[in-house]
């Protein structure tokens, strides 16, 4: 692998994943990953542009940012690209009225959306709400439509909480795709449109940006597909086999966000 100086040259903007990079979640709350609060502060004091890019779909953007602020992070709602607000914009633009299969924690994001006589299904990480009854109702809504539209907030396979690995929305999305014979539209990582909207928000071109995440496919692979560079942290859902993934090779592997920021601040101006 090329030297760090070569791999990080020309970086002007940084996209940061949240869960597994900044903090770990659990049923009882969230805890900051060691060194990450200081790492974000150092990044924001540097000339680099910073944007937070998350697939979080169990909390509203306001609640998510509030939790992070309580942990000590310097972050505001305006600095976060998240799938629920982006999905609401799409629904309004296209005149779509969703049947929602989502977590109660994110439902407030959809308060302004017309849900009468649904003409699409929106699915997110619904947690305990992923019952047979709820999945079957979403299936029925899709099958009743002449042109079924399924929108998924991300398509992650799993994520990590302090209690262990948790099934993410991707498996349920795939079940509905298979049962209905359709292809879902993904709003969130690794969708190219999602990454591009985050880059537009900080005015940085893909070749000048680097993604830092814990998901080898969604964060690293997705960013690289858009022309960005990407680092994987060995926190969150990272697994040792990720460094030998058959399809995705990160531009570098670091122990945590603090190490990534050390390297960025050391080499990006060189």
UniProtKB/Swiss-Prot annotation:
It catalyses: diphosphate + H2O = 2 phosphate + H(+). Mg(2+) binds at residues 17, 19, 214. Binds 1 Mg(2+) ion per subunit. Substrate binds at residues 17-19, 54-55, 189. Its EC number is 3.1.3.-, 3.6.1.1. SUPFAM superfamilies: HAD-like. It is an enzyme of class 3 (hydrolase). Its cofactor is Mg(2+). It is found in: Cytoplasm; Nucleus. One of its GO terms (cellular component) is nuclear speck. The keyword Cytoplasm applies. The keyword NADP does not apply. GO terms for molecular function: inorganic diphosphate phosphatase activity; metal ion binding; phosphatase activity; protein homodimerization activity. Keywords: Cytoplasm, Hydrolase, Magnesium, Metal-binding, Nucleus. Homodimer. Phosphatase that hydrolyzes imidodiphosphate, 3-phosphohistidine and 6-phospholysine. Has broad substrate specificity and can also hydrolyze inorganic diphosphate, but with lower efficiency. PANTHER family: 4-NITROPHENYLPHOSPHATASE-RELATED (PTHR19288), PHOSPHOLYSINE PHOSPHOHISTIDINE INORGANIC PYROPHOSPHATE PHOSPHATASE (PTHR19288:SF44). NCBIfam families: HAD-SF-IIA, HAD-SF-IIA-hyp3. This is Phospholysine phosphohistidine inorganic pyrophosphate phosphatase. It comes from Mus musculus.
């Amino acid at each position: 692998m090329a030297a760090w100086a070569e791999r990080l040259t020309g970086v002007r903007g940084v996209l940061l994943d949240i869960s597994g990079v900044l903090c770990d979640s659990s049923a009882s709350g969230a805890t900051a990953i060691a060194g990450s609060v200081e790492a974000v502060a150092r990044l924001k004091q540097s000339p680099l542009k910073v944007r937070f890019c998350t697939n979080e779909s169990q909390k509203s953007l306001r609640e998510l940012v509030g939790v992070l602020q309580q942990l000590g992070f310097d972050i505001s709602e305006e600095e976060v690209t998240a799938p629920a607000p982006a999905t609401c914009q799409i629904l309004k633009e296209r005149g779509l009225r969703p049947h929602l299969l989502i977590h109660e924690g994110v439902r407030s994001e959809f308060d302004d959306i017309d849900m009468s006589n649904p003409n699409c299904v929106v699915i997110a990480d619904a947690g305990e709400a992923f019952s047979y009854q709820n999945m079957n109702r979403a299936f029925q809504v899709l099958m009743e439509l002449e042109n079924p539209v399924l929108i998924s907030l991300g398509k992650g396979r799993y994520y990590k909480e302090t209690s262990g690995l948790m099934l993410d929305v991707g498996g349920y999305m795939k079940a509905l795709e298979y049962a209905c014979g359709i292809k879902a539209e993904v709003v969130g990582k690794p969708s190219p449109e999602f990454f591009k909207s985050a880059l537009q928000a900080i005015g940085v071109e893909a070749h000048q940006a680097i993604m830092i995440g814990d998901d080898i496919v969604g964060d690293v692979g997705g960013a690289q597909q858009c022309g960005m560079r990407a680092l994987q942290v060995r926190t969150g859902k990272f697994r040792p086999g990720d460094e030998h993934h058959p399809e995705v090779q990160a531009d570098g592997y670091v122990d945590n966000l603090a190490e990534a920021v050390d390297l960025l601040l050391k080499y990006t101006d060189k």
